[in-house]
Amino acid sequence: MKTTANSKLSILVVDDDEIIRMVLRQSLEKEGYHVSTANSAEEALNTLQRSFFHVVITDIMMGEMNGVELLLQIKEMNSLMQIYVMTSHGTLPHVIQCMQGGAYDFFEKPLKIEDILISLGEAARRATRWSSLYSRHSLSANGK
């Protein structure tokens, strides 16, 4: 298990495919990330209202609410949320919508864990910088 910034990064994986959720969870936890899963966009929104996550990785094509709609709703809740989308071949228009809507990156299925880990390393660095900036701002706002 890694003990870098990974161990502080919390990730929500959203996919209606149980195998994808399980493989991502196991792979990312092995690298030291804290991982939760949701099997639908609706479950993801409920989870995000109860818990804090640095990153959401979501499938684009899901049941009643797709990943594009989920991304837009999450961005309304938290504009700084780092969202990554997963797609199967042939969903390029949806990927473009997600990137225009604020997704940080996209991963094509079949997934390559190495690509995801590279993006999450960048996400961890961003989260650390934002946390540091927020802490400094909070201290200066309180006169310390």
Regions picked out by a protein language model, each given a short descriptive name:
Residues 46, 68-80, 97-100:
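Short amphipathic alpha-helix used as the core "switch/output" element in two-component signaling
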Residues 21, 63-64, 87, 91:
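The feature encodes the CheY-like receiver
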Residues 18-36:
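Two-component/phosphorelay signaling modules centered on CheY-like receiver
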Residues 91-93, 111-121:
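C-terminal output helix
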Residues 39-43, 65-69:
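Acidic catalytic/metal-coordinating carboxylates
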Residues 56, 60-61, 85:
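The short loop immediately C-terminal to the conserved phospho-acceptor aspartate in CheY-like receiver
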Residues 1-10, 130-131:
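Non-catalytic signal-transmission and effector/linker regions of two-component phosphorelay proteins
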